[in-house]
Amino acid sequence: MSHKTQCKNTAIFAYNEINLYFFRYLFVFVHNLDYLCRKNQEIKEMEYTINVGGKLIDFCSPKVMGILNVTPDSFYSGSRKQTEKEIADRCNQIVAEGGDIIDVGAFSTRPGAPEVSEAEEMERLRNGLSILRREQPDAIVSVDTFRPDVARMAVEEYGVAIVNDVSEGGITGIANKPLDWKQGEYPKIFKMVAHLRVPYVLMSVKPNIEQMLMAFAHEVQMLRDLGVKDIILDPGFGFGKTLEENYVLMNEIQKLKVLKLPLLVGISRKSMIYKLLGGNPTTSLNGTSVLNTVSLLKGADILRVHDVKEAVETVKIVGRVKGEELRVKG
């Protein structure tokens, strides 16, 4: 073999070895990069946690909040539960179908709903919560109210863990509800939540994402000033927004994640679905599942729903598509 041929063979061998090492290290690099990216995502997701009765709840997988309305006039007739059996069955159904939180409301916020006195709201809630606690003593419960004293009763007497307020702290004057806030003061419900030391759902009626972000930033700071640490944001679909504004907002809710707080979305069977498709709340389950899917893909951490089973299935499927390892009951 000539010296020239030997040199050529040596060069080819060296080239092949270099390629082998290059691709080997490239594989290791890509594998490690993928691992680091996944870990970074896990860390980001773990940032969203709330303290519920001494238990740390994380949002590595989205949670499902099942609705229990102890009212005679909520907009979706299928959600109205008044008798002892109806309330008990609904509580057990939410848990059996994989719901993480039971949200109890006694004041309908549908347009045109009659005013309910504070005493009547408390009476309805006491009845509903006593049945709930008998049936599901360990359930995580939120109370849907804008009234500070109602929130205090629910937390102190029945161990309710979360206050879900649709009035944006009373700042907005939702529907029939009077304003209890003046410029320069802290809203009464903010002060009550700080006193109770429970997580708080802050809902907005602002019609667009820009106004919402500005308002949320200010309101979150007020809550922080009072010592409220666990805050959940709700963009308030169906509240103070036109049909078009609701859908524009749905396309932009991921922008709320800049505030680094858990995001709750409640679009279950709402008019933004059936007004678009033609129908009513009863025929809006499919549309609800579609919008819940969009919400999850855009970063929703909690789905507030009437139909728990379908929402849990949506969470599982979207999680698989996103490559998440979900820890969902059921």
Where are these regions (language model features)?
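Structural motif
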Residues: 62-65, 230, 262
